[in-house]
Swiss-Prot record:
Residues 191-352 form the CRAL-TRIO domain. SMART domains: SEC14. The keyword Acetylation does not apply. The gene is BNIPL. Residues 119-134 have a biased composition (Acidic residues). May be a bridge molecule between BCL2 and ARHGAP1/CDC42 in promoting cell death. It comes from Homo sapiens (Human). Residues 32-156 are annotated as: Disordered. This is Bcl-2/adenovirus E1B 19 kDa-interacting protein 2-like protein.
Length: 357
């Protein structure tokens, strides 16, 4: 009996071992399947840590057991399967050069990855340059450099525009008095000794209207007679003096008043001289001229202007205006600062009586 019972027990033990063998094999296969599932999980997105509700710490054995218990034994390749959409944070690229306080670290940074594998961008962990750090890019702007500088503007051009510093007097060894006018890159030397009696031909008559509309008077009664010695030399330097003085007196627009009364025919300059004056006159002076007012124009003055029309522009011709008396001139501009020669006043009284002025 004892032998039969022992044999039965051995038989039961063997049957149990045989029955447990498939379970052990299934458990081994299940473990292999888990390993394969973990390897495949690198290719497929996993559940969010908040949704899984488990810790993903690889050193926590309890977490491994719970993850193994919740991992499916098969992959459902067909049908609807809840998948988490993987969001990748954009790379943060700063095109800044290396600063002195970065310790060799490049300022070009990418979004840091969190230890749990999520793609949340931690703004507080990004390194930003402090206010005390200065970049060595060489493109920093100071308060003085924000406005462009006129580097190409020379001293002579600045003086010409401002009307200061472009004229000085020089005395020669022979006692001649010279005046130098600097007009841009050019310098004009004027023999003031020979033109001293004729300097009154050009004068400043104040301003007209709003702004800086200067009034320039040209009194032809002060011109030299053509019978004097060195007439061409005197007229050339007189023209230089008039142009240089205009550059000093005229800042913007101006009104030129020609007082032709009291001028003899011997004082009328030749046509070639007037044509040369017009061509040599700076374009700025021709453009800024608002009007040329001719007072007491005689027939030969009008004939002169008619002969000059082929050589002057139509715009300049339309700027010419003729007045018959000083009274008409007083209605156009103020005569308080205008110096009118006595010969012109006498002619106006002879033509219009005492009420002319």
């Amino acid at each position: 009996m004892g032998t039969i019972q022992e044999a039965g027990k051995k038989t039961d033990v063997g049957v149990r071992e045989i029955a447990e063998a498939p379970e052990l094999g299934a458990a081994l296969r299940h473990g292999e399947l888990e390993l394969k599932e973990e390897w495949q999980d690198e290719e497929f997105p996993r559940l969010l840590p908040e949704e899984a509700g488990t810790s993903e710490d690889p050193e926590d054995p309890k977490g491994d057991s719970q993850a193994a218990a919740g991992t499916p034994s098969t992959l459902a390749l067909c049908g609807q399967r809840p998948m988490r959409k993987r969001l990748s944070a954009p790379e943060l690229r700063l095109s800044l050069t290396k600063g002195p306080g970065n310790d060799g670290a490049s300022p070009t940074q990418s979004a840091p990855s969190s230890p749990d594998g999520s793609s949340d961008l931690e703004i507080d962990e990004l390194e930003t340059p402090s206010d005390s750090e200065q970049l060595d890019s060489g493109h920093e702007f100071e308060w003085e450099d924000e406005l462009p500088r006129a580097e190409g503007l020379g001293t002579s051009e600045t003086a010409e525009r401002l009307g200061r510093g472009c004229m000085w007097d020089v005395t020669g060894e022979d006692g001649h008095h010279w005046r130098v006018f600097r007009m841009g890159p050019r310098e004009q030397r004027v023999d003031m000794t020979v033109i001293e009696p004729y300097k009154k031909v050009l004068s400043h008559g104040g301003y007209h209207g709003d702004g800086l509309n200067a009034v320039i008077l040209f009194a032809s009664c002060y011109l030299p007679r053509s019978s004097i010695p060195n007439y061409t030399y005197v007229m050339e330097h007189l023209f230089r003096y008039m142009v240089g003085t205009l550059e000093l007196l005229v800042a913007e627009n101006y009104l030129l008043v020609h007082l032709s009364g009291g001028t003899s025919r011997a004082q009328v300059p030749p046509l070639s001289w007037i044509r040369q004056c017009y061509r040599t006159l700076d374009r700025r002076l021709r453009k800024n001229l608002r009007a040329l007012v001719v007072v007491h124009a005689t027939w030969y003055v009008k004939a002169f202007l008619a002969l000059l029309r082929p050589f002057i522009s139509s715009k300049f011709t339309r700027k010419i205006r003729f007045l018959d008396s000083l009274g008409e001139l007083a209605q156009l501009i103020s005569l308080d600062q205008v110096h009118i020669p006595e010969a012109v006043r006498q002619l106006d009284r002879d033509l219009h009586g005492s009420g002319g002025t």
